[in-house]
Swiss-Prot record:
Tissue: Expressed by the venom gland.
Lineage summary: Eukaryota, Metazoa, Ecdysozoa, Arthropoda, Chelicerata
Disulphide bridges, residue numbers: 45-51, 47-190
Similarity remark: Belongs to the arthropod phospholipase D family. Class II subfamily.
Organism: Loxosceles rufescens (Mediterranean recluse spider)
Name recorded for this polypeptide: Dermonecrotic toxin LruSicTox-alphaIC2
Names of required cofactors: Mg(2+)
Length: 273
């Protein structure tokens, strides 16, 4: 999965997919009532990027639905996964549950079209704080209460805070999550980060009793880091330059071992090294 980083303006959806992304990451900010308000990262952000793109959340979801609905004039067959990077830093632990229910209702109405031929992409809810695991509970319960529990088949989860994996496992236990787990590891492209923890995550994925299904590394903009990520055995690479990742995947060392995922590849299924 080649994951276009910080796609917060509607025009950026086309831009990143046309560069070769089959997945995008979108930042979601919340208001004081725990409503998902807009797609916006803000300052500071990755080096070399404009941090200020923003779109009202329902409007972004509608555009995303068009981009992922077969037959729509804006449809991109390649765009199969969307990671919502949920900026929950200003929310209390109690509000995390509310944020989850409101995320679910927004997605149900504006993205899934109330279950009637909505967008087809898989969704990952990426949460920065383990203490906000209630967001997952709220999300799941809201979809059940709305009569659309089947849409949870399209939803996965990620805790993005680079926490100890044992603590991540415990947060999922509290949230009642078994499966559909993506594990991120990384840092802004302005800094260098080693591969120790990402290798631990891959080892968990590949073990008989691991809780992780997929591992992705962020933010990778250089060819040398791309190669190191692939050598570590990751499933996804988040990048500001999807074309760079694509070109490395076409190198002789990698093109027989890796390919770009399509809609037929189940993002919740563990593919072991």
């Amino acid at each position: 999965w080649i994951m276009g980083h910080m796609v917060n303006g509607i025009s950026q959806i086309d831009q990143f997919v046309n560069l070769g992304a089959n997945s995008i990451e979108t930042d979601v900010s919340f208001d004081k009532q725990a409503n998902p308000e807009k797609t916006h990262h803000g300052v500071p952000c990755d080096c070399g990027r404009n941090c200020r793109y923003q779109t009202k959340f329902p409007d972004f979801l509608k555009a995303l639905r068009k981009a992922t609905t077969p037959g729509d004039s804006n449809y991109h067959e390649k765009l199969i996964l969307v990671v919502f990077d949920l900026k929950t830093g200003k929310l209390s632990e109690n509000q995390a549950y509310d944020a989850g229910t409101k995320m679910a209702r927004n997605l149900l109405q504006h993205y899934w079209n109330n279950g009637d031929n909505g967008g087809r992409a898989y969704i990952v809810l990426s949460i920065p704080y383990l203490k906000h695991y209630g967001l997952i509970t709220g999300f799941k319960e809201a979809l059940k209460n709305e009569g659309h529990e089947e849409l949870l088949e399209k939803v996965g989860y990620d805790f993005s805070g680079n926490d100890y994996l044992s603590d991540v496992k415990e947060a999922y236990r509290k949230a009642g999550v078994t499966g559909h787990v993506w594990q991120s590891d990384g840092i802004t492209n302005c800094w260098l980060r080693g591969f120790k923890r990402v290798k631990q995550a891959v080892a968990n994925r590949d073990s008989a009793d691991g809780f992780i299904n997929k591992v992705y590394y962020w933010t990778v903009d250089k060819r040398v880091t791309t190669r190191k990520s692939l050598n570590a055995g990751v499933d996804g690479i988040m990048t500001n330059y999807p074309d760079v990742i694509n070109s490395v995947l076409n190198e002789s060392a990698y093109k027989t071992k890796f390919r770009v995922a399509t809609y037929d590849d189940n993002p919740w299924e563990t593919f072991k090294n």
